[in-house]
């Protein structure tokens, strides 16, 4: 199937979580950019067993990324999402792990450093 086109999911004052229609596993990326979606910088890669539930979780500010996302939105950035639907959560994790080996995602690095310090 491949990666979806980037989708705007949040501005400073509004979350858009009603577009997601996939209830299955996916690998996904979160990034920031301007209002028209140009020059998106991808900050985070993750995997989930249910794409729709994950997006709703982000929209309700109940995720482990809440502080990072809120800070970027307050600075005037727009939050974008793109996903890669797969058949199993294991396949989503495999894609995530490949991307983590290949690219440096600053939010993943920041969260991993924080969790190591807390242990």
Question: Could you describe each region identified by the protein language model?
Answer:
Residues 1-54, 77, 83-98, 117-119:
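GIY-YIG nuclease catalytic motif and its immediate N-terminal context
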Residues 10, 67-69, 105, 109-110:
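Intrinsic disorder/low-complexity signature
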Residues 52-75:
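A broadly used, surface-exposed interaction patch
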Residues 102-119:
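Intrinsically disordered, low-complexity regulatory tails
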């Amino acid at each position: 199937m491949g990666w979806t086109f980037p989708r705007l999911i949040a501005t400073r004052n509004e979350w858009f979580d009603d577009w997601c229609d996939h209830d299955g596993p996916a690998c996904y990326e979160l990034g920031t950019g301007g209002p028209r979606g140009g020059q998106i910088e991808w900050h985070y890669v993750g995997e989930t067993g249910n794409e729709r539930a994950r997006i709703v979780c982000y929209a309700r500010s109940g995720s482990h990324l809440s502080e990072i996302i809120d800070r970027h939105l307050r600075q005037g950035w727009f939050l974008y999402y793109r996903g890669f639907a797969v058949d199993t959560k294991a396949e989503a994790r495999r894609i995530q792990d490949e991307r983590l080996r290949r690219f440096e995602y600053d939010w993943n690095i920041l969260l991993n450093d924080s969790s190591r310090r807390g242990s």
